[in-house]
Amino acid sequence: MKKKRDDSVSLSLKVTRIMKITLILILVGVIQVSATTYAQEHRISVSVKNGTFYDVVSQIERQSEFMFFYKSEEIDGNQRINLNAKNKLVSEILDEITKNNNLTYKVTGKHIIITKTAITSQITKEIVGVVTDERGEPIVGANVVEKGTSNGTITDLEGKFSLTVSEKSVLIVSYIGYNTQDVTVTSKTVYNIQLEEDSQALDEVVVVGYGTQKKVNLTGSVASVSSDEIKDRVQTDVLSSIQGTVPGVTIVSRPGKDVSINFRGRGNLGTSEPLYVIDGAIADATFFSNLDPNSIESISFLKDAASSAIYGSRAAYGVVLVTTKQGKDGRMEVSYSGMVGMKAPTYTQDLVNSWEYAELYNEALYNTNPSAGKNQGYSDEEINLFRNGTKPDLYPNTNWVDLLFDDWTATTKHSLNFSGGTKKLRYFAGLGYVYDTENIRNRDTRRYNLNLNVASDVTDWLTFRGSVKYIQRNKDVDGGTPSFDNILIVPSTFVARQSTGEWGSVESGHEASGTFVGGNPLRAYSTNDWSKNTIENSMYELGFDLKPLKDLVITGQGTYKSYEYKNKAYVSLKDDVPSFLNPGTVIGGTGNTTNSMEVNWKKHSFLTYTGMANYSLTKNIHSLSVLAGVSYEHYQEETLMASRQDFPADSFSDLSAGATSGALYQNGSSMQEYKMFSYFGRINYTLMDRYLFEANFRADASSRFYADNRWGYFPSFSMGWRISEEPFMKSMRHIIDNLKFRVSYGTLGNINNVGNYDYFQNYSGTGYYSFDDTSAKVIKESKPANPSLSWEKVALTDIGLDFDLWNGKLSGTADYYIKNTSDILLAYNVPLETGISNAPSQNVAKVRNRGFEFALTHRNTIGEVSYMVSANIATNNNEITDLSSSNDIINNLENGHGVAKYILREGESIGSFYGFESDGLYTQEEIDAGHYYTYGGVTPNAGDTKFVPQRELDWGEEITDSDRTIIGCEVPDFTY
């Protein structure tokens, strides 16, 4: 009975399974029938005028449930389609758009698959022809290709070609600077093909201040870089990526410092940073440098006063205009760009090994005192112990570079972009990620990018725009930061770590000094120290474009930019290092008695409002454009600092775990703000497309100045002459596409070196006075007020020539400029008797920059391969012309050692190095003959540097600071 019951259950399960399968098959059949019926009966209307295949597909998908699948390389996106299908079957529309494109389609359910028509054997024939331009001149090197194949040729010196093609095929004829033309092969065998000039080649639009202009109509010095030129570079920041792409623009990179940019030399005694503008909003170098290059559409560099005066007091040292990518009408496009790589330093210090060090040390001692013999420092036995490595605890061979640096480190960057939209709504979204490691171990940086742009055409005359940009950069350091000087100074004869696991305490078989032990680079690196640094940059924009009249556009934009910096650093407790040679004892002074943590936080916000109106009018041979606008800026900044010591253990990562009393607990804060209000305007006038005139004006009022000096006015004027458009150049138009001469002059202001409260009187609360038996804290004047403080001024003259030859194959620019900066802020030394610790800055110094710039670009297409080669060179002569009778100003280099110095001196360049000139090394013969100079009260030995005096000295007299001279300059004379 049990077996029968099991059989019945099994039979029941089989029946159930069969019923389920049958039901599924029925449902599938119904779905297929439904899909087929949908494909056969669904009607839509499609209207496309001078559109593309993609425009038709987009309309079908919007009006139906169909989804298209195809390979983009099989679709000719350039072919123009004119279609007006009303209430047509989808299949009828598909027949129409595929019949002349060598395409076929297949409907599967609600999926439409477009494929290339299989090529069958066809009858071929030979055709010949000539390709000319609109003036009948032959075009040399034009491409003639049979559509859909790799079969093609190029025209000869007379513009002629011959080609064997299939009957009823289509020829694609193209040449740079001309519109591509499709020619259908008919029964004839001779073809005369005339190409029309591509107006876009000369109508290239360049982003300028508060707008765009045709490149050929520019009268100022403007250079532009497209995303294609930088997006594939391996550098992880934008500033490094543009190095070498623009003449006169120099990228300055120093270890431990942010990368900076310099236009046409150093213009003053402080910072010469340009203004950064991203999608119309003012930004800074940090924001710009950390943008994702794959989200950038173009970068314009405004280098002269004519192009940058409209930004007034912020544009004294140029303007960098960034335009990010925007959405376009059409189906969503997804693009990805990624790079994973390894990097290595081009040069690392080649340190001598321990036995070489010992031999050189012996040689130096012998040169100092030959009578003491040749092994004054190390015996031959000790040198052999270094060499054979049999006693590494006593006679090591330590290579500090190998211990702390990696030969290769990883770097990677990824970008993912989405764009698309409809005629009413367009969007672009870009995501970016960068991971980069340093050559010193356990140092890494991560960067995250978001760029979102949305535009909506509410009506034909009103468009709203919005964008969000967000950047986060995290830099983590796991372990301490060894002194780079120690890596080079601590000799290879010092043990990094003993075999017992303790830190090195032996140098050349002897107990090392506390200085060596405390400066052990490996120990400094391997501690429980750590630091975490985070920078968050965000920008939010809302704007509109209103067109109340045909030629009038009113634009408004509001921007809020936020910057937040957070840094937390911990210094761990370190015990004194135990002695390896004297167990049970320690080497004093090699540890620290307490641990500590410090937190720094800084946030600033920048709010801007801009409103402007632009009116354009073209009538007959006249073209006029007028721009007028206002802007308002408000900057606010807050900082906080807190530190504590005496943490219970290294595992604590929060400040609250530290001590809360006395000197073990500190904090501080600051706040500041400024405001600016501005008027600006521009007039462009063009006569007969050959005579160009432009005038810019800006008036800025800044809270950084006293009321009487608050306003600054900055005009510029420029003119251009398109020589190529003159009638007498007609015979040269087959060679010269564009030849333009331009000249400009303008004045700009600089506010970057002015503090928010520099014109105020400053007080400090340091020091005490005694009144009878009572001590009272004193508040005293530390810096007098300076109500006359005003703008630094820049006057810039530029003469330039632009040319495009052979239909854009060769193009270039040449410029000569003179930039005079006056009223540069300079603080005089104040006598100590005044009791003033800080002198107020005054507008007194002057600097001049002069130079040439030249850039050349070659573009060409060979077959299906397009390429571009460019080169540029720029010279710059920088000179301090006036320090207002002030003495030379000498400053230490940023390393703080006070050895190498900068000097500011009239007639010399900013950034001049002030040091001792040397003439090789002293020989023993010179020392014996007394032909030497002392330095620091010390008589030199053979092998010491031979300093050259800059005044009359007798042998044996002392070299002093009076013998320093200019030995170089950090500002290059030319770049290329």
List each language-model region with its residue ranges:
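Extracellular/periplasmic, surface-exposed regions of secreted and cell-surface proteins
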Residues: 230, 266, 273, 447, ...
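Acidic, Ser/Thr-rich peripheral helices and adjacent loops at domain boundaries
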Residues: 486-487
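Switch/connector loops and helix/strand junctions flanking conserved nucleotide-binding motifs
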Residues: 215-216, 310-312, 330-331, 345-347, ...
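Short, small/polar-rich motifs associated with maturation and membrane association
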Residues: 1-451, 458, 463-465, 512, ...
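Coil residues (strongly favoring Ser/Thr
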Residues: 204, 285, 651, 774, ...
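Outer-membrane beta-barrel biogenesis signature
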Residues: 497-510, 732
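Conserved small-residue
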Residues: 335-392, 641, 861-974
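Well-ordered, non-transmembrane segments within structured domains
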Residues: 36-38, 130-134, 145, 155, ...
